[in-house]
Amino acid sequence: MAKIRVHELAKELGIASKEMVEVLVELGLDVKNHMSTIEDSQASWVKKRLSKSDEDSKKQPAQPVTRDEAVKKHSGEPATQTTQKKPDNPRHVSGPRPQEGSKPSGSTGRREFSENREQSRKGEERHSANPRPGTQMKSPRNNAPRPTTRPENRSAGATGRTDNRAPGAAGRTDNRAPGAVGRTDNRGAGSASRPDNRVTRPAAGRPDNKGSRPSDAKRPPQRTVPGNTPRPVSSPERTTEKKPGEASRTLPGGAKTAGDKKAFRKNTPAFGQYQSKDYSRPGRKSKHKRKKENIEFQTPENIKIEGSIMVRDLAEKLNKNPAEIMKKLMELGIMATINQNIDFETAEIVSSLYDVKVERELSEEEKILEELVDIDDDAELIARPPVVTIMGHVDHGKTSLLDRIRQANVVSGEAGGITQHIGAYQVTIKNNKITFIDTPGHEAFTAMRARGANLTDIVILVVAADDGVMPQTVEAINHIRAAKVPFLVAINKIDKPQADPERIKQQLTEYNIVPEEWGGDTIFVPVSAKSGEGIENLLEMILLVAEMNEIRANPDRAAYGLVVEGELDKGRGAVATVLVLNGTLNIGDYIICGTNWCRVRAMIDDRGKRVDKALPSMPVEIMGWSGVPEAGGKVQVCDEKVAKEIIGLRLSEKKIEEQKQSSRVSLDEFFQQMKDAEVKELTLIIKGDVQGSVEALRQSLLRLATNEVKVNVIHSAVGAITETDVMLASASNAIIIGFNVRPDSKARKYAEDEKIDVRMYRVIYEAIDDVKKAMSGLLDPEYKEKFLGRAEVRALFKVPHVGVIAGSYVIDGKIQRNASVRVLRDGVIVYEGQLSSLKRFKDDAKEVVENYECGIGIKDFNDVKEGDIIEAYTLEEIPREL
């Protein structure tokens, strides 16, 4: 919602900024100075309010002056006679002038204002005293500053001009002499100043030295303009305090002169002390008061918010005070300042407290990306190769099956014979292309399997006929159902003697996977990766499922896809395997993924050949990235300017998230950190060859944490182990784990000098086992008590500077020096401690066996008595395991 500043509104209405501030304050708006802002809706309301008051003022009829009244004024009759004849008009009633020093009833600010004006009249009267005969003396009021215009916003009920007003109605207090006639001027809204038509006469005597005004007989009569109403005569009972609903007097067309304004501001108390008082007529509600009660900004029904919003901005959207929003957050347990960001969910909860619906507004990044998205026309779509993901339990033959299809040997290149990377390959079968994605089956590669299920069109669930349904098989089924993709089951290893395909079908029915021959909708294909049996049938089923699902794409548009895997190659830099889902990717295109961008300099297919373009469903390796992109990230083609703009926005969001994570610590969090400090910690640095393997190893190691020992991975990245990694490990006392990477010569030498433990692995479960052993070494050991023997105290000897020595007889086992002992008295433990001395006669003894006498000294214990039993034992340490 647009806003306008106070000084801009004042300029638009032709009012001084300070006067505009006073007007807005009186109208109930919260403004501080001329730079404050108000909503456009509020500004429109103010304009309507002022224009309405102007119209009301113009509609108010002026009080006519009769000819008899004018004659009486010219004849010099006091105004009191006129008012006595018309008692129904209280405005013409004049009371006795208060004595000097008395305090008239009324506001202090008005009294001081009147005194200032009276002092200015003293000087004028002194200047015009004792004129020469024949000269004319002007009324002392002629030289006083008088307003040239009238306020617009004075309605008939608050201007003090109507004749039927009750006594005490609001009016302008003027401490004039008794019987003084009110000054007349045109009080119409927006009227210009009128000429002074007063009658002058020869001056009378000099005014008294007390500064009192001339009496009625000495003052000249004043002529009133027909149609105007005389100004009310002041009285001691009058007050000039504004009613709460009365409009401001300093509006367009009615501004005071500079002198009056300065005196008024200097001597008038703050508006707030009159704000709570009600001076309206009894039994009648002021029109302005009724209007003011309706000045309540409505809470909107719907608002739009981006991902996060500041508390101040949320309050503005809800038309609420920020303090009120902060109070609501405190009730929700969130301590947020006015300039602090809160997330979308929190803003939605707060808005729901006011029955406001919140809609998520697209961020700047999403708006830019939305412009890049082209809507494909059905006429432009053509069939594309299906993307097939092979999933299943570890060692069930997934990669061997893919090798048979590709007629390649991928398994031999994998350490330990298990797949530890996610690979993408494209094969051609009978002029039809199929893209295969091979996922790891090991437990540690859960994220890889989930990613493989999400970027695929068809899934092949591989189950070994001789092994059956295993844990990772069940996990793969869950990933398939979560991704909502069609799948078929390949029962592998049917060539083995113990193979039982029917048992596999029976087991899968427990997970609602029923074969077609049993009345279900799932295709089961028995195959043998070793002999090649059933491979042709499997490929035909894949093409059949792809044809049924109408897998299509538009090659004549800007490409987008997903990152299958990312790595940091020493010779090629950051490299990512990208699967193009739609469009065509060309050399020279700018692409973005997360916070990384790339200008495509080279593309290599799955067989190592360079290609100039990548069509839909084609996996390619792309070089030239600014950093290693995250596996599973979305790849989008755009121009260079847009790419840098989007990357800048994403980096800013990332920085904000990091600041949130490292926010100020509350007292509860501080106590929690103190408790966590008691937990031992194994600090690790992980380096790997590809992003997916690093991610899988990191998640597997973090799951090893217990209540006593936790794993803290302070750094994980793709690439070789460098000297910087060793320096970080030295500073943080960490262990470096390298997965399929090696340290360079400088890093190796530096690690030897600093005695940093660097471990290299090629199989993921070996790394997990070693870390588990290291964590076991950090656990507090368990102790087992081993009984040694008992001795009975039969005599006590006091040795100076040593203490009490217990002359004892070994009745069971043996007593060893430096053993732990406990003193038993009547079967109750009296003391536990250490032996300080063990002697046989006067010689020190290492141990004393059964049926021998000895002298035993107990450390820090002398309260030994005859008949006590001293029991000796040792504590054996037993290492713990996770």
UniProtKB/Swiss-Prot annotation:
Comp. bias regions, Basic residues: 282-292
MF (Gene Ontology): GTP binding; GTPase activity; translation initiation factor activity
Main localization of the protein described in the UniProt heading: cytoplasm
Pfam families hit by this protein: EF-G_D2, GTP_EFTU, IF-2, IF2_N
Binding positions (GTP): 392-399, 438-442, 492-495
Tree of life domain: Bacteria
Keyword GTP-binding: yes
Role description: One of the essential components for the initiation of protein synthesis. Protects formylmethionyl-tRNA from spontaneous hydrolysis and promotes its binding to the 30S ribosomal subunits. Also involved in the hydrolysis of GTP during the formation of the 70S ribosomal complex.
Protein's UniProt name: Translation initiation factor IF-2
